[in-house]
């Protein structure tokens, strides 16, 4: 039997007191109190299976791993891969029954779903407590017309409402490799999300096809854990905005956020309507009542996205001549992962995709938050140009609920990339 400090004290107390082993009651009481404090602290610090990384991967916990896909819509234990070929005529129950007709049940009968125009499909409906730890999906069709929404703890207004392409950094509707800690996009359209998303009571994830023509084919997997959630855990939020054109030249990434939380990052899709360098604009964070002047002000757009000097490395070509060109890059926390240079025919516009994740440096707020970025380039003669670009963004943050209601999402005609 393992001897604990409590056992040792019990043995001592049972001994007949003598001059040599008599222990004052005050010392016994203090010893017991110290042990209780240590055991309470240990219980509170018991690993819950969240915040996984290489530094704690060896730690065991009581967390339960579950996963939702079209092969197991509920994520229940022992309920995956049960699609029946006899249900081939029912929508989204045995969609690949024809391909599996020679093999039968258990052989990839329902790996995907189809969502018709105007329909919303519930991808996940989970009872907590727990946390989403990874989402993988590969949506077909026009990504701006597929709207991802997430609801926490039975709320009626979504905490996440974003076109699926923009949520994964693909706002221009075309693939570009994105490799970061929070989001990865791999060939040919494999969207991966690693933002941790804890919830206490319930998690609901939906996808809506707002297009008017084509059905959406979607393969997806939502990996989550059922475990206790810390009392100080905030809820994940993501909100989409677009201005085309940005008539104010002072683009709002987010405003109207109320409560306590922290800003975790942004993805931006910027389409430039003028010649020359377009990224002189400063980002500004208005925190907890700031009005005319912010608490935090950046020094330029490429600076905020952790680059410098127009993202230009000024490389020499094969002839030894210096050439100016944008240099795409991906890092764990920031990147210029997409540059669409135009083809000189119908795709004439320069377009850029950028991300910045504040994973190690979140911008904290206690009451409210507003974030803006200037749409700023150059006139001739060294004068700033207030631009009118096509700008879309997704702001990511965590906060305590309830959250303020989001602005109305634009209709598909205003979302369209053209």
Functional labels for PLM-detected ranges:
Residues 44-418:
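Beta-strand-centric surfaces of beta-sandwich/beta-rich domains
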Residues 1-44:
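Bacterial Sec-dependent N-terminal signal peptides
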């Amino acid at each position: 039997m393992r001897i604990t400090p409590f056992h040792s004290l019990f043995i001592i107390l049972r001994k007949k007191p003598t001059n040599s082993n008599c222990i004052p009651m005050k010392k016994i009481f203090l010893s017991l109190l110290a042990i209780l404090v240590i055991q309470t602290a240990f219980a509170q610090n018991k690993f819950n299976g969240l915040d996984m990384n290489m530094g704690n991967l060896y730690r065991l916990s009581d967390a339960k791993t579950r996963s939702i896909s079209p092969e197991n819509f509920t994520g229940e234990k022992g309920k995956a891969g049960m699609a029946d070929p006899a249900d081939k005529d029912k929508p989204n129950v045995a969609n690949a029954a024809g391909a599996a007709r020679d093999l039968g049940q258990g052989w990839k009968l329902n790996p995907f779903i189809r969502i018709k125009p105007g329909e919303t499909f519930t991808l996940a409906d989970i009872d907590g407590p727990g946390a989403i730890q990874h989402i993988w999906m590969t949506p077909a069709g026009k990504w701006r017309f597929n709207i991802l929404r997430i609801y926490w703890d039975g709320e009626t207004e979504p905490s996440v409402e974003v076109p699926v392409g923009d949520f994964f950094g693909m706002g221009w509707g075309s693939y570009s490799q994105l490799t970061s800690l929070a989001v990865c996009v791999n060939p040919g359209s494999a969207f991966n999300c690693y933002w941790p998303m804890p919830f206490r009571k319930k998690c609901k994830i939906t996808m809506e096809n707002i297009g008017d023509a084509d059905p959406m084919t979607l393969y997806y997997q939502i990996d989550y854990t059922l475990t206790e959630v810390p009392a100080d855990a905030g809820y994940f939020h993501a909100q989409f905005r677009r201005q085309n054109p940005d008539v104010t030249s002072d683009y709002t990434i987010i405003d109207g956020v109320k409560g306590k939380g922290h800003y975790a990052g942004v993805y931006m899709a910027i389409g430039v309507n003028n010649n020359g360098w377009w990224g002189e604009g400063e980002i500004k964070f208005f925190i907890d009542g700031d009005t005319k002047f912010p608490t935090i002000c950046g020094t330029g757009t490429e600076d905020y996205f952790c680059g410098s000097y127009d993202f230009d490395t000024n490389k020499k070509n094969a002839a030894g001549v210096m050439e100016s060109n944008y240099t795409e890059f991906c890092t764990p926390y920031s990147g210029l992962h997409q540059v669409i240079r135009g083809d000189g025919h119908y795709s004439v516009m320069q377009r850029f995709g950028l991300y910045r994740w504040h994973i190690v440096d979140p911008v904290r707020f206690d009451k409210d938050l507003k974030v803006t970025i200037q749409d700023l380039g150059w006139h001739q003669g060294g004068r700033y140009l207030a631009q009118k670009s096509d700008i879309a963004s997704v702001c990511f943050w965590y906060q305590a609920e309830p959250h303020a209601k989001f602005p109305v999402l634009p209709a598909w005609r205003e979302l369209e990339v053209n």
